[in-house]
Design a protein with these regions (language model features):
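Structural stabilizers in ordered domains
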Residues: 1-267
Length: 267
């Protein structure tokens, strides 16, 4: 990766885990520690050439993508594969589909981890906001967000729905006890307790009395009900909206049509 960013961490710098902790961890993709990126690319030189500026921009995007869209279960490492993807700035790849695919696969993998140090990867902000908006389980007790700056003539400057959860109360209870509590509550939840369409319905989609969402979030709404494989590098997961028709304001047949999602089909 020296050809892309001009340097690479040494083996010692890239290995952010040591001893027994390292042995217990599941295998992770080769990359650079976030601390290494911060040390070497935190500030772009004031007299930087165009090539240096582009390198810093690419590394910054790599850092953000690895920490938000595709974080691994360690939370400490930026895999090289995401940096390679950023060699083409004007690509037309579907980052949203890839993010969802990666999250699905991380949820699959997390269910199979049994070590004390086992973690979960994927976009936890996306998963958290989705859950908080719909399920009365694990939802923060208090939520508020600061007023968005006024720019009435540019809807594309409006925030996304996650901004509603900008400031939340944190849970400080014992993790194991809260896990047991959440599992028990999820096992007993009823359809009537679920907020199926938190973003509004029909022509009011994205507009609530207290919040107005960025219209870019609805740009691809004609694809929301498409049944297809979602692809993210090695991971392939199926998009099966027919299982959750009520999220789209539609009647939910019961049981939904069965689709084989065996592991063999993921490869």
């Amino acid at each position: 990766m020296i050809a892309l960013i001009g340097m690479a961490p040494t083996e010692a710098e890239a290995d952010v885990e040591e001893g027994e902790e390292k042995k217990k961890r599941e295998r992770k993709a080769a990359g650079a520690a976030f601390t290494w990126i911060q040390t070497h690319f935190a500030t772009c030189p004031p007299d930087a050439t165009d090539d240096v500026i582009q390198t810093h921009a690419r590394v910054y995007m790599w850092y953000v993508v690895s920490r938000t869209l595709f974080p691994d279960s360690t939370g400490k490492n930026a895999p090289w594969m995401w940096l390679k993807v950023l060699t083409v700035f004007d690509s037309k790849w579907s980052w949203g589909s890839a993010t969802l695919t990666y999250l699905y696969r991380q949820l699959d993998d997390a269910c199979c981890r049994i070590t004390d140090s086992a973690g979960i990867g994927g976009n936890m902000l996306l998963l958290s906001v989705w859950s908080w908006e719909r399920l009365p389980v694990g939802r923060p007790k208090s939520v508020r967000f600061n007023p968005w700056y006024e720019d009435e003539h540019d809807e594309l400057r409006c925030p996304t729905w996650a901004y509603k959860w900008d400031v939340v109360s944190e849970m400080t209870n014992d993790v194991n006890l809260m896990y047991q509590k959440y599992v028990a509550e999820l096992d007993t939840i009823t359809p009537e307790q679920v907020e199926w369409q938190p973003y509004g319905a029909d022509d009011r989609l994205g507009y609530t009395p207290e919040f107005r969402i960025n219209p870019m979030c609805f740009r691809d709404r004609d694809l929301w009900l498409m049944r297809c494989p979602l692809i993210c590098n090695w991971a392939i997961e199926f998009h099966l909206p027919h299982r959750v028709f009520r999220q789209f304001g539609l009647f939910q047949p019961h049981p939904p049509e069965w689709v084989d999602t065996d592991k063999a089909l993921h490869r």
